[in-house]
């Protein structure tokens, strides 16, 4: 691995070159996200040894959104193991948008992937809990253990999401009717919406990825958060479905597991070595941060990390 000074230099270059790149627009179907300043941008690296390099608005707290699916998948794996997740949710790409109903219809109403909305709600329903609040607190605790104890829900964002999540409610009932929902469907939808409504900064997001890169050990706190054997399962899902409809393009061009969120976050992982996180609100047509993709890809390429290059 390069020295941290080299990594910082590459991070600085990524920010300088792409933090003002044009194109894209904030997500406008969630009022909270529509109002975030679109000129914000940040990029950060956290290594498997806990070293940090960052540039830009790296302390700005933004919505985790779909990147939360990684954390809930991790918890479901801890609770039940890979085989149960594969059987009860699925572990294959859908080839369709992240909120697709057609993807369910085409596959017997099975969600297929924990990293699309249907699969993420199924994951939330699978988490061991005796009540709605216990389910929510366990998911929030997993986000904090992977990233930082400072990660917390935004009541404003949650309210904004809960009043616009009619499509997800419909998906939850479809899953319930097919036997792929493991608690009350509206409870699962509520908790899923909350998990997407937490705020974190770019360094904390990179720490989430670095914990997975480091075989489940948080390199900042030293806690063994996940069983080492679960981390490859998480990264495999990120490779197949993590970047929405652009997952194949990301694997082709960058060659690393990735996950995006409509809050503007991008996370990519170099197994065993580091994680790269980026943030900027304007999104492309499939919901990925325009600048975030450019910054994260630049860092990975400049440091020479691509799983498919010998």
UniProtKB/Swiss-Prot annotation:
One of its GO terms (biological process) is glutamine catabolic process. It comes from the Bacteria. Pfam families: Glutaminase (PF04960). Keywords: Hydrolase. GO terms for molecular function: glutaminase activity. InterPro entries: Beta-lactam/transpept-like, Glutaminase. Its EC number is 3.5.1.2. Homotetramer. This is Glutaminase.
């Amino acid at each position: 691995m390069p020295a941290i000074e080299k990594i910082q230099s590459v991070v600085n270059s990524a920010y300088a070159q792409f933090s003002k790149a044009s194109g894209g627009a904030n997500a406008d179907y969630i009022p909270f996200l529509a109002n975030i300043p679109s000129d914000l941008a940040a990029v950060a690296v956290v290594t498997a040894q806990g070293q940090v390099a960052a540039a830009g608005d790296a302390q700005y707290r933004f919505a985790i959104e779909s990147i939360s699916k990684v954390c809930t998948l991790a918890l479901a794996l801890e609770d039940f193991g890979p085989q149960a997740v594969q059987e009860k949710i699925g572990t294959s790409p859908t080839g369709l948008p992240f909120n697709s109903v057609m993807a369910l219809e085409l596959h017997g109403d099975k969600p297929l992937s924990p990293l699309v909305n249907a699969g993420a709600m199924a994951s939330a329903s699978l988490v061991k809990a005796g009540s709605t609040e216990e389910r929510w607190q366990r998911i929030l605790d997993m986000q904090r253990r992977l990233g930082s104890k400072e990660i917390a829900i935004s009541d404003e964002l949650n309210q904004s999401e809960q009043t616009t999540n009619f499509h997800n409610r419909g998906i939850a009932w479809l899953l319930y009717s097919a036997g792929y929902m493991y608690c009350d469907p509206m409870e699962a939808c509520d908790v899923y919406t909350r998990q997407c409504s937490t705020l974190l900064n770019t360094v904390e997001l990179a720490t989430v990825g670095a914990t997975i890169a480091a075989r489940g050990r948080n390199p900042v706190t030293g806690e063994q958060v996940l069983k080492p054997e679960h981390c490859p399962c998480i990264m495999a899902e990120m490779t197949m479905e993590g970047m929405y409809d652009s997952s194949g393009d990301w694997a082709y061009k960058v060659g690393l597991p990735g996950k995006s969120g409509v809050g503007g976050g991008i996370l990519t992982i170099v197994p065993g070595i580091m994680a790269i996180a980026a943030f900027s609100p304007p999104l492309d047509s499939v919901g990925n941060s325009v600048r975030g993709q450019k910054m994260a890809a630049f860092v990975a390429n400049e440091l020479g990390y691509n799983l498919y290059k010998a």
